[in-house]
Regions:
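Short, acidic Ser/Thr/Gly-rich low-complexity loop/linker segments typical of extracellular
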Residues: 49-59
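Short acidic/polar hinge/loop motifs at secondary-structure boundaries
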Residues: 60-63, 138, 175, 180-208
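Residues embedded in well-ordered regular secondary structure
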Residues: 122, 131-133, 143-146, 150-160, ...
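Extracytoplasmic gating/loop element in the C-terminal half of outer-membrane beta-barrel translocons
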Residues: 596, 834, 887-979
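Conserved small-residue
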Residues: 238-303, 534-536, 734, 751-860, ...
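Extracellular/periplasmic, surface-exposed regions of secreted and cell-surface proteins
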Residues: 128-133, 166, 173-174, 323, ...
Length: 1017
């Protein structure tokens, strides 16, 4: 027995020694095909949890046993297995995984770019992060062909986006957004709720083939957002933060006190001489203008004599400060991953009190429960707190009299000493509290079952809960309360919207020989409920409680209460087939059958099919020996897309419940029409879309060019039109009219220089689209947009054969000169006067009189082409990136500039009027000025004289960044460290004379200087 024990002991010791002998430390380096180190690659002993990740030089060290196999993986590269034969260093060269790198996420499914047959543009998170903005739309500007983005008009607003121009008349042109499979629109500040740092990639779906799976909701295009996930390897903690300082980018130049004083004096003098041609002008100037308060108040004389200038806009302005901070944590393994982020943004605008604070939180997690079962969630919550300032604050400040001393004691801003009860003092208006809060919860939760190879069953339940609350309080001690007789007013508006979406799909993928087939069927159900309540109270004895105590308003007869509710549903059945033969011939066929509650029974359902094909010519044998193209792919597609973008219950005539009576006589309910007549037979608006495209790559894929041409014909437009008063209704919605839209798109990406330490990349987009109205209701060839006095407006009119966005106005005949008067006196000006120095409209139809028939379409607000370009230089750790956007050929009205050039000195005036007509300056650009007398003449705003050219080239962002070298980062025990400085909206080359041709005249455009930090460990 002892002998046996001894033998066993010897064997155990031998085995232990042998095991110890096999336990070795292996070192190695992981690089790419250019010998650049791959940072953060996962190195794991196959079949175990023993592993590590590579450092900043691509190196790793791991204790293993001889004969074990290392599994090396990194996202975007082909994984490799390396068997350990000894303790000699291991060098692993990883090749790019083109299958993964070329994938885009479309409709919750990953597809290789080379397999796409539709028009899809992809933008990575790296590109999005090149501009320090908090809105994804702003980050996309100039990056995607066919996508036109306008900057937000206020810091609390979203940037607007259009994909492939105008495809409808009355309806919205906004696309839908799909965030991790959840379909949403931009209401309730939706897109502004997305944290840009959480975005992994964005795909923009532009044609019917690409948007087909979204049916009617994708008629204006689809923006698909995929958020970040955790990655395999060691956990990662990162921080991204920046702070920016904002100033006015552009303020149109206005006259100072002396210039404005002389302008008004000249206007009064011209008015006097026009009505008193034989009068004593010197006596009038000395005795009336300068010797009385006919033209000037005493405080205006004082400002003129002492050369005082008061800048009211500056008094309500400040240097804006915006800062953004995001912390994220992520990790993953073979069984699951998670990504968690927290964000905070504070944007103090350039107008006093204007501010937006935003809080975001996100958790993305997935877990492989079984080899055939995976579950996951993508959930985010956003709270946005806006402190709003009434538009009138800036407008009244910029319109204020520069001869009026700045004070918060005066109630209204006056010109010539004349009391203006509606021109409230903007400094006092800043006392109004106006708070707007959005809360939004987005949660997409899925279960994925793979019972057999190739078969995939996925069920996703998503919820989008949005809450909006706006509270406003107007104090009882400012003139607004006195003017409107409220003695203080409090308002409480609350909106809630709940959307749930349930998607189920069954897909099967099979390959046999050179054939690859992917088929999918599915259903989608969506229900949206909306609730609104408003309460108003007036009469407050104290301002202490603001809008927090509506019940204390003592004016009981001025209390208000209103509510609204609506519900809509959409049920869809979906089928899609993708076919691929040898990577050469690709075919995609899709059909979606949508049923909407917005239409009456019998018209609720619509079927929307699409088909597209592609030919990878470079995969053909006859192309193997050519050296020009690395890729040459032709694409063609056709599809029908629906649109249901109308109000709920438009097929019914709706009535509001009201009441009549008094507390003495009693109250009775009555039903009052809302003015719109229902149309029971309205149905889907339908678009037919055609797309042709070609994708090319040259010089070892370093230059890529995509070109697309499209045609969209939209008929049975859901249009609202007016009705005769004899019908008892004011309007109705019908399937009437048609519009056509066509265009070209170009997208270029080039790696111009690629050396060891230096790289230069360039990207550009160019888009052209043109729409025209091809049919209106009835036999009409024009539908005018008229105001309450039946005056035809300059914009909003519809003409057959013209764009939806025309400008309809008189053409300018010029400034009348003495030599023209014989000819001009023969024209009937319909109550207006034309004399030397006056502007006059052109008699377009040459009938000797000026009327509405002389107005013409002089252009549209649509650009002839638009796009953007960027250039990126990098040398070692230093990089310089510039992003430009441009637009050409659009025309635009600027109400602000029209006000400035229409001034007679009794209002703020443009310095352009320094070059005005006088008998000594007959070649002036601007007409003479007249005031103080009854003289009816044409103003600049009534003619195309005031229409602006809206072409521009804007430097959207210029960024200088430095990424610290590996030695420094390792010494600090970090994974990444980058600092940068960015200038946004540094310049804009344009002939536009308003504030900004993108943001408009309502809020001044800003320029921002930003300093940022990115670090990870």
């Amino acid at each position: 027995m002892k002998r046996i024990r001894l033998i066993n002991l010897i064997l155990i010791m031998f085995c232990c020694c042998n095991m110890l002998a096999q336990n070795i430390t292996v070192t190695g380096q992981v690089v790419d095909v250019t010998s650049e180190p791959i940072i953060g690659a996962s190195v794991v002993v196959k079949g175990t949890t023993n592993g590590t990740i590579t450092d900043f030089d691509g190196n790793f060290t791991l204790s293993v046993q001889k004969g074990e196999t290392l599994h090396i993986s990194y996202i975007g590269y082909v994984a490799q297995d390396v068997k350990v034969m000894g303790n000699q260093p291991v060098k692993v060269v990883m090749a790019e995984d083109t299958e993964t790198l070329d994938e885009v996420v479309v409709v919750g499914t990953s597809m290789k770019k080379s397999d796409l047959t539709g028009a899809v543009a992809s933008v990575s998170s790296k590109v999005l992060e090149e501009k320090p903005v908090t809105n994804v739309n702003q980050a996309l500007q100039g990056r995607v062909a066919g996508v036109f983005i306008s900057q937000p008009t206020r810091p609390t607003d979203d940037a607007s986006i259009k994909i492939r121009g105008i495809n409808t008349i009355n309806g919205s042109t906004d696309p839908i957004y799909v965030i991790d499979g959840m379909v949403m629109d931009n209401s309730f500040s939706g897109f502004n709720a997305v944290n840009l740092n959480d975005v992994a990639s964005i795909e923009v779906l532009k044609d019917a083939s690409a948007t087909a799976l979204y049916g009617s909701r994708g008629s204006n295009g689809v923006v698909v957002i995929t958020t970040k996930k955790g990655k395999k390897g060691e956990g990662k903690v990162s921080y991204d933060g920046w702070i920016g300082f904002q100033t006015y980018a552009n303020t149109p130049k206005t006259m100072n006190t002396r210039q404005l004083f002389e302008l008004r004096k000249e206007a009064y003098t011209n008015g006097y001489m026009q009505t008193n041609p034989d009068g004593d002008v010197n006596a009038y100037v000395n005795d009336v203008i300068m010797g009385s308060n006919t033209a000037f108040a005493d405080y205006e004389f004082d400002a003129y004599d002492n050369n005082k200038n008061y800048d009211w806009l500056d008094a309500v302005s400040r240097t804006g400060v915006q800062h953004n901070h995001v912390v994220s944590l992520s990790n993953g393994n073979d069984k699951g991953s998670y990504y968690i982020s927290f964000g905070y943004t504070d944007n103090k605008g350039v107008i006093e009190k204007s501010e937006q604070e935003k809080y975001t939180g996100r958790i993305n997690a997935d877990q492989q429960i079984k080899s055939w079962l995976k579950v996951g969630t993508n959930t985010t919550f956003t709270r946005t707190e806006n402190t709003l300032v009434d538009d009138g604050v800036m407008n009244r400040a910029r319109c204020a009299n520069p001869m009026l001393e700045i004070s918060d004691e005066i109630e209204t801003l006056n010109w010539q000493g004349i009391f203006d009860q509606n021109n409230f003092n903007p400094l006092r208006s800043l006392k109004v509290d106006n708070d707007l809060v959005y809360n939004r919860l987005l949660s997409s939760n899925y279960i994925n079952i793979n019972p057999i190879e190739g078969l995939n069953l996925r069920s996703t339940f998503s919820i989008d809960y949005a809450q909006k609350q706006q509270n406003k309080y107007t104090p009882n001690d400012i003139y607004e309360s006195e003017r409107y007789g409220t003695q203080g007013e409090a308002k409480d508006d609350r909106d809630t919207r709940t959307v749930w979406q349930w998607d189920n799909s069954l897909s099967y993928e099979v390959s046999f020989g050179k054939h690859k087939l992917n088929a999918m069927v599915g259903t989608s159900a969506t229900r949206t409920t909306y609730n609104y309540i408003n309460a108003t109270a007036t009469g407050f004895g104290t301002n202490l409680f603001g809008y927090h105590s509506l019940g204390s308003g003592y004016k009981k007869d001025q209390r208000g209460l209103s509510t609204a509710w609506s519900e809509q549903t959409l049920l869809s059945y979906i089928a899609r087939v993708n076919y691929n033969y040898a990577g050469k011939y690709l075919l995609t066929a899709t059909a979606r059958y949508d049923g909407s509650s917005k239409f009456a029974k019998g018209n609720q359902w619509g079927i929307f099919p699409s088909v597209s094909a592609a030919w990878n010519i470079t995969e053909e044998k006859f192309m193997k020996n050519q050296t020009i193209f690395d890729q040459l792919k032709l694409r063609a597609g056709f599809g029908i897309v629906g649109n249901q973008n109308i109000d709920d219950f438009a097929y019914l005539s709706l009535y509001n419940v009201s009441y009549t009576g008094t507390s003495d006589t009693g109250y009775t309910n009555s039903f009052v029409s809302n003015g719109r007549r229902g149309t029971p037979d309205i149905s889907w608006e339908k678009q037919k879309q055609w797309n042709l495209g070609v994708d090319m790559a040259f010089l070892q894929n370093r230059v890529r060019l995509s070109v697309d041409a499209f045609l969209i014909k939209n008929k049975d437009l859901l249009m609202s039109h007016s009705l005769p008063t004899t019908t008892g209704f004011s309007s109705t919605i019908e399937n009437i009219g048609a519009i056509e839209n066509k265009g070209l798109e170009f997208a270029l990406n080039a790696n111009l220089v690629r050396a060891k330490d230096f790289e230069w990349n360039f990207a550009a987009t160019l888009s052209m689209d043109k729409n025209k109205v091809t049919r209106l209701y009835g036999d009409n060839d024009v539908v005018y947009n008229v105001d309450s006095d039946r005056n035809i407006q300059k914009e909003g009119n519809l003409f057959l054969g013209e764009s939806r966005n025309t400008i309809y106005i008189w053409k300018t005949g010029g400034i009348a000169q003495e030599i023209d008067m014989d000819r001009l006196n023969k024209i009937n000006w319909n109550g207006y006067n034309v004399n030397p120095g006056d502007l006059y409209p052109l008699d377009y139809d040459n009938n000797g009189q000026i009327d509405q028939n002389d107005r013409v379409v002089i252009g549209s607000t649509d650009p002839k082409f638009y796009g953007g370009f960027s250039t990126d230089f990098s040398w070692k750790g230093l990089s310089l990136n510039a992003v430009f956007s441009y637009s050409y050929g659009a025309k635009k009205l600027s109400p602000w500039y029209e006000t400035l050039i229409g001034s007679t000195g009794s209002g703020v005036a443009s310095t352009d009027l320094l070059d005005r007509w006088t008998p000594e300056n007959t070649d002036a650009e601007f007409p003479r000025v007249l005031a103080g007398f009854d003289y009816n003449h044409y103003g600049a705003s009534s003619m195309d004289f005031s229409v602006q050219k809206a072409s521009f080239l804007r430097l959207s962002a210029l960024t200088l960044a430095y990424t610290f070298p590996t030695k420094v980062i390792n010494a600090l025990k970090l994974a990444n460290l980058r600092v940068y400085a960015t200038g946004s909206n540094l310049f804009c080359l344009t002939n536009y004379n308003g504030y900004d041709l993108e943001t408009g005249d309502w809020y001044p455009p800003t320029r921002m200087y930003t300093f940022g930090l990115n670090l990870a460990f």
